[in-house]
From Swiss-Prot:
Known partners and oligomeric status: The cytochrome bc1 complex contains 11 subunits: 3 respiratory subunits (MT-CYB, CYC1 and UQCRFS1), 2 core proteins (UQCRC1 and UQCRC2) and 6 low-molecular weight proteins (UQCRH/QCR6, UQCRB/QCR7, UQCRQ/QCR8, UQCR10/QCR9, UQCR11/QCR10 and a cleavage product of UQCRFS1). This cytochrome bc1 complex then forms a dimer.
Family recorded in the similarity comment: Belongs to the cytochrome b family.
Purpose: Component of the ubiquinol-cytochrome c reductase complex (complex III or cytochrome b-c1 complex) that is part of the mitochondrial respiratory chain. The b-c1 complex mediates electron transfer from ubiquinol to cytochrome c. Contributes to the generation of a proton gradient across the mitochondrial membrane that is then used for ATP synthesis.
Bilayer disposition of the protein: Multi-pass membrane protein
Entry's cofactor comment: Binds 2 heme b groups non-covalently.
Localization: Mitochondrion inner membrane
Coiled coil start-end: none
Entry keywords, A to Z: Electron transport, Heme, Iron, Membrane, Metal-binding, Mitochondrion, Mitochondrion inner membrane, Respiratory chain, Transmembrane, Transmembrane helix, Transport, Ubiquinone
Cofactor: heme b
UniProt entry tagged with the keyword Transferase: no
Name the record gives this protein: Cytochrome b
GO molecular function, one term: ubiquinol-cytochrome-c reductase activity
Binding site for a ubiquinone: H202
Originating species: Tragopan temminckii
Length: 380
């Protein structure tokens, strides 16, 4: 038999073992599509981002007009920008669903894969934040000032740290320049960590909805899951294109159509929708350092999830009590997202505080307790 280059060539062999002949569980559902969708999001964002960077000027006097110029005068510049801005939203939708899938089906028990995933989430959040500053609109400036200022809550070194990050005594030209450098660099860092994420995943193989070993029943990735991934891609690209073409500014803030002015503060500084849940947790603590710690904890708590798994079963498929708790957590996050978009006044303050408290309570206390209870129930 003639040697197959796909299986013998050093580079093609790696691609083959990762994307073609990879043995995959036969029963993984559409919830397992989001990994490949995230890869597609990253590819799209890097491509559109490169095209935008070719027309962008990282200078406080020119940034806003260079973005306007891209939209007005560059061939399809408006489309590239709208795809890039809304592509970020879809990136976050996919990553939230991907994390939710991991929580529900106990995928976090692959600790290395889970931890690299959390690092990817943090890097993505950093990338989105520095990217939002680049158009240099009012909300870009306000957001940059507020969020970088949070570092000043760190005892002793805080103030020095903030001024070091700013490159001066306020958010100014050096800040914009370094944010552009970071926004250009970080997506490639994400691509690198993604490869590590995949290496760890392929050490164990995929989990499945039943949470049991699938070694006895594997199917090749191609054509089954390659085709399924293409279907997932079309189902994601359709709403993305619809949003970018019909309502490109739906998720944006009108304040960002005004060029940045350090002398005027927007009435309500709020981040993009995908940060609102964390922003609500930050605001619900009436102390700067406490708020910053809660903000960090809201995402870093994911690192604790594997250690809080007390159930004898891996997935929640056959655990109705944990399922109820899971959907309560989802509803709780939606409430936090909504509260984060509202002004700081009654009743939103108390709603935010209650939602923040219940967020941590569900994850740290109720999940382990419920799992232990279910274990006892299964024994009878």
């Amino acid at each position: 038999m003639a040697p197959n280059i796909r299986k013998s060539h050093p580079l093609l062999k790696m691609i083959n073992n990762s994307l073609i002949d990879l043995p995959a569980p036969s029963n993984i559902s559409a919830w397992w599509n989001f990994g490949s969708l995230l890869a597609m999001c990253l590819a799209t964002q890097i491509l559109t981002g490169l095209l935008l960077a070719m027309h962008y000027t990282a200078d406080t006097t020119l940034a806003f007009s260079s973005v306007a110029h891209t939209c007005r005068n560059v061939q399809y510049g408006w489309l590239i920008r709208n795809l890039h801005a809304n592509g970020a939203s879809f990136f976050f939708i996919c990553i939230f669903l991907h994390i939710g899938r991991g929580l529900y089906y106990g995928s976090y028990l692959y600790k290395e894969t889970w931890n690299t995933g959390v690092i990817l989430l943090l890097t993505l959040m950093a990338t989105a934040f520095v990217g939002y500053v680049l158009p240099w609109g009012q909300m870009s400036f306000g957001g940059a000032t507020v969020i970088t200022n949070l570092f000043s809550a760190i005892p002793y070194i805080g103030q020095a740290l903030v001024e070091w990050a700013w490159g001066g005594f306020s958010v100014d030209n050096p800040t914009l320049t370094r944010f552009f450098a970071l926004h250009f660099l970080l997506p490639f860092v994400i691509a690198g960590i993604t490869i590590i994420h995949l290496i760890f995943l392929h050490e164990s193989g995929s989990n499945n909805p039943l949470g049991i070993s699938s070694n006895s029943d594997k199917i090749p990735f191609h054509p089954y899951y390659s085709l399924k991934d293409i279907l997932g891609l079309t189902l994601m690209l359709t709403p993305l294109l619809t949003l970018a073409l019909f309502s490109p500014n739906l998720l944006g803030d009108p304040e960002n159509f005004t060029p940045a002015n350090p002398l005027v503060t927007p009435p309500h500084i709020k981040p993009e929708w995908y940060f609102l849940f964390a922003y609500a947790i930050l605001r619900s603590i009436p102390n700067k350092l406490g708020g910053v710690l809660a903000l960090a904890a809201s995402v870093l708590i994911l690192l604790l999830i594997p250690f809080l798994h007390k159930s004898k079963q891996r997935t929640m498929t056959f655990r109705p009590l944990s399922q109820t708790l899971f959907w309560l957590l989802v509803a709780n996050l939606l409430v936090l997202t909504w509260v984060g978009s509202q002004p700081v006044e009654h009743p939103f303050i108390i709603i935010g505080q209650m939602a923040s408290f219940s967020y941590f309570t569900i994850l740290l206390i109720l999940f382990p307790m419920t799992s232990t209870l279910e274990n006892k129930m299964f024994n009878h």
